[in-house]
Amino acid sequence: KIIINLANNGVTIFRLDAIAYLWKKSGSQCVNLKETHEIIKLLRIVCNSLKSKPIIITETNLPEKENLSYFGVKNDESHWIYNFSLPPLLIHSFLFEDSTHLNKWSKNLPMTKIGNNYLNFIASHDGIGMRPAEGYLNKDNLWKFFKRLKKNGGQLSYRKVQGKSKKVYEANITLFNAFQKTDYDKKGKYFLERYISAHAIMIAFEGIPAIYFNSLFGTSNDDYKYIISGNKRDLNRYKWNKDRLENLLKKKYSKQSIFYHKILNLIFIKKQNKAFHPNAHRESLNMGKKIFCFKRTSLDKKQVIYNVTNLSSKFQRVILDHKIEKYKNLFDKSKKSHKLIPKPHETLWLSN
């Protein structure tokens, strides 16, 4: 009755927060129980029966295999699931100029079927979840990752394992601070390029992009709020004054205006190209650890777009299919040779 009433009053998306813990059973860990999946199936049946066809999104910050299970064996559970592995692996790839783990994950990630989608994001009001990186980043990778994030102003939140030892559950930091400096770019010369390219990958990837409000403006850590509250998540929960933000956006060269318009441009280009359809085919291409590359092909197979990202703080040489010479970069409409030399942390969207 609640679902039907809300849908009849205009609700089009139902987000099921931490739904994996819904069903409680004595003697179990009360996570991912079959009863929880059955309830989601029932909710899906209700949504499918309504004229407005509302969408169900499950929020399950878990290792990837468990997260994927919420599509249902017969695609009969959630319409969309959060792509939780993307944030830690994408951020790690830029900070360490290494596509190895991101590429492995991308190649293993199953394609979605029409009606199902990944909800892609790289920041939220919570921290950067680390459980979804399990199986891709080993202890040494994680230790170096945490060390760099802390150097950039981040904090770490922990979870207890079997009531005894503790593991990092999430890193609390804004994207602005996370991308600010790396071991290869200690002065932060290319932090803006890292920031925008990370969003370009997320927006171009198979699925539907979701951009955290504060990320639109390159918002930095709210250290003042964290000192007062002691809540690590407050680092990434800055509250804007509406009038102040609007005034900053009117200034062409303000930090907020620069970040905002660059990200808006990515969204504008995405909307114009059918190879960026949420279910358009995705193929990962191995171009060496300094490059992250994937190809999107439209559902009608008429448009192909290559996303080519230089993860390095140095110029890189990339050789693609010779047919690339007929392609253009969607950012500036320039034609490109199959021999590419992307700038430090530059992303190219090459379309036929």
Language model segments and positions:
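Active-site and adjacent substrate-binding regions of carbohydrate-active enzymes
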Residues: 1-325, 330-352
